[in-house]
Design a protein with these regions (language model features):
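GHKL/Bergerat-fold ATPase module in large chromosome/replication-associated machines
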Residues: 117, 135-158, 178-181, 188-684
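GHKL (Bergerat-fold) ATPase N-terminal catalytic module, capturing the glycine-rich phosphate-binding loop
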Residues: 1-184, 192, 199, 217-219, ...
């Protein structure tokens, strides 16, 4: 065939510099594109064999070779697929593939970095010109009588095609790398890119360095394969003093190891996979030495094709990033990590792989957001996660409880972000009580209602005889509006005083220590209008205090007024809110409470950066509660002119606040100094 020269028809001037600009962040995608082309060629050749239109040669092993040559600054991609004729090169390379590149550019030209194209698919063969000054193709078609073809182009605008000298069916693409891309001629860099994009492609991929010194292994002669290159036969005699026959060994050229696992775990039936398989795959893909808690194997053929494995990692929230990594594949070809348009946001704390061949690739992120098919994929993934968790709750409760502390933040986040997921999970949510026993919300509500009913019964018995008809009617209306109160703890150490008081009276509370719990209890209150969540220090529970007898009320009010006056004076705060109660726990002299409403207001202020504002503007200062049954409080009432009143008042206030929240540096300094002063008084 005569030499043929031609010029590509270019609609946009300088197409390749423009393409480089848009895919700069992922300019290594040319490796994925060229290897994918090779895989496609091999797949098509195998299909022709299955259809009887071509017979594969005996011993045929599909493979793709990638050869780097730092000295010559080249990178070669060689496949043994179906190859191309001169007409096919003309049609594919100069028309179809180039058309794909121009379409790629059309899609990109109006995109911003915020609306990036997913995975940069569609550039295909012309991605080679992102890194190469010159590209050559040598190919031989499988068709009988086909002649080899050599095609070359510098810069991608002009090309030259003539008869080549390739003798085996398939295609070789040689890239003469530009000065900015010489890194890809480095074997280690090339391996890194291949492992990123091609680790699970359906064809074996072998990387080698041109002119590299061969490496050898010594194996038992019985293990030598027909494909091995034996360089030496070795006879090993038994060591001196040892019995046995001489061992026959063979020194062979080290066998090449494929970069690609052609049958990754997610492509297998879950019944074929063992626990060790799942753990080994997790460690290999995510380089995490810790074992995952458990996993979900996705396997769906209808109404769309989706396979994958999602792992629930064990996260040390104090040190580890909560962000996970979910790798998205298309027919075992890597697309990108954490595509939030496809994978529900709350699943981003997981690690895993999802392979969806039906996923639209050559689209922007904004297009994916409004794609009905993509939404169905996200819904399916969310549903399978909920099904797995509900199944564990029902059939493997022991392990479910064991994992709960690790997985609960993720599940709660899912409930907040996904209405359907929240609905599916509502009966499988667990809450840990003060005895570290796990309960459902239904159990907690029943228990709380039982406690309140018992308390109400006792109170009702005391006052029933003196009620008028109007009062009884009013009480009936109040009961109807009254909500079931569920108390919770956010810090078992900080709030230990309140916890001990609750336990002493047989009262329970649930433990909610994660940052997400603040939003989650609001979500629960919206879902369960009859329930109100109160932090354990939001109020003094009725069970923690004694009622003031009718004949003592007048005197008790005088005591209260006196203590309010004393504390406001000694603490220099006329707005200080002070309550006096007859607490059952006589070891507690003072405590602080902050209403749930005010505390949530404080949290909201912090969230919106208003933490420096005066909390009293929103009525969100804590109330000091004094125990009228405690000797120190009684001393203050009886000796309000004592020289020790000031130090006792300040100490009782700080002790109450310590159990409620951390003191500021200034407050802590004053507290420590005052504590030392008190001890010095004891020495006198």
């Amino acid at each position: 065939m005569a030499v043929k020269k031609g010029t590509l028809s270019i609609d946009s001037e300088n197409i390749f510099p423009i393409i480089k600009k848009w895919v700069y962040s992922d300019h290594d995608i040319f490796v994925r594109e060229l290897v994918s082309n090779g895989c496609d060629a091999i797949t098509k050749l195998k299909k022709l064999d299955m259809m009887g239109e071509y017979e594969l040669p005996e011993g045929y092993k599909p493979k793709i070779e990638v050869i780097v040559n730092p000295e010559e600054k080249t990178m070669k991609f060689i496949d043994n697929g179906l190859g191309m004729t001169a007409e096919e090169v003309e049609e594919y390379i100069t028309q179809i593939a180039f058309s794909g590149a121009t379409q790629f550019l059309e899609k990109y030209k109006d995109k911003t970095t915020e609306d990036d194209m997913i995975g940069h698919f569609g550039l295909g063969f012309y991605s080679a010109f992102m890194v190469a000054d010159e590209v050559q193709i040598d190919t031989l078609s499988y068709k009988e009588g086909a002649k080899p073809v050599h095609w070359a182009s510098e810069g991608g605008t002009e090309y030259e095609m003539q008869e080549g000298n390739k003798t085996t069916v398939g295609t070789k693409i040689t890239l003469y790398l530009n000065e900015d891309s010489l890194e890809f001629a480095n074997e280690y860099r090339a391996r890194e890119v291949l492992e990123r994009y091609c680790s699970f492609m359906p064809t074996e991929i072998f990387l080698s360095k041109a002119n590299a010194e061969p490496e050898y292994d010594t194996i038992d002669e019985d293990d030598v394969l027909d494909t091995d290159t034996v360089v030496e036969h070795i006879t090993e005699e038994p060591k001196e003093g040892e019995e046995g026959e001489p061992k026959k060994k063979a020194k062979i050229v080290r066998r090449p190891v494929s970069i690609s696992d052609t049958h990754p775990l997610w492509t297998k039936n879950p019944s074929e996979c063992t626990k060790d398989d799942y753990i080994d795959f997790y460690r290999k893909v995510f380089m995490d030495y810790k074992e995952p808690l458990f996993w979900i194997h996705l396997n769906m053929d209808y109404p769309f094709n989706l396979k994958g494995i999602l792992y629930f990692p064990k996260i040390n929230t104090e040190y580890d990033s909560i962000e996970g990594k979910i790798k998205l594949y298309n027919n075992q070809v890597f697309i990108a990590d954490n595509i939030k348009e496809v994978i529900p946001e709350f699943l981003m704390v997981l690690k895993g792989v999802i392979d969806c061949p039906d996923l639209p690739l050559n689209v922007s992120r904004s297009a994916l957001q409004n794609d009905g098919f993509v939404n169905k994929v996200a819904d399916y993934i969310s549903k399978k996660v909920a099904d797995k968790l509900n199944g564990m709750f029902k059939t493997d409760r022991e392990n479910y409880e064991k994992y709960w502390d690790d997985i609960s933040p993720f599940i709660k986040f899912g409930c907040l972000k996904d209405e359907k997921f929240g609905e599916k999970m509502k009966n499988s949510m667990l809450y840990k009580n003060l005895d570290h026993k796990y309960m459902t919300l239904e159990d907690i509500i029943k228990e709380a209602k039982g406690e309140e009913a018992e308390a109400a019964k006792t109170e009702e018995a005391k006052t029933e005889e003196t009620k008028t008809d109007a009062e009884e009617s009013k009480d009936a209306d109040a009961k109807e509006e009254e909500k079931t109160r569920i108390f919770y703890v956010t810090d078992e150490v900080q709030q230990s005083q309140y916890i001990n008081m609750f336990k002493a009276q047989g009262q329970d509370a649930i433990i909610l220590t994660h940052n997400i719990d603040s939003a989650f209890i609001t979500y629960l209150e919206q879902k369960h209008q009859e329930v109100q969540f109160l932090r354990i220090d939001a109020d003094v529970h009725d069970s923690l205090k004694d009622e003031v007898a009718e004949d003592e009320k007048e005197e008790f009010q005088k005591t209260t007024d006196s203590l309010v006056e004393i504390f406001r004076k000694e603490l220099g705060n006329e707005k200080l809110d002070v309550k006096v109660e007859k607490l059952k726990d006589e070891n507690v002299a003072s405590m602080a409470v902050l209403s749930e409403e005010n505390r949530r207001m404080q949290e909201m202020m912090k969230m919106y950066g208003m933490g420096g504002m005066d909390a009293s503007m929103f009525g969100s200062q804590a109330t000091l509660v004094l125990n009228a049954n405690h000797p120190l409080v009684q001393f203050l009432v009886a000796n309000k002119d004592s020289e020790n009143v000031s130090i006792i008042c300040k100490q009782l206030y700080d002790l109450a606040m310590l159990a409620h929240k951390p003191l500021s540096p200034e407050e802590m300094t004053a507290f420590v100094k005052r504590s030392n002063d008190i001890m010095m008084l004891l020495t006198k």
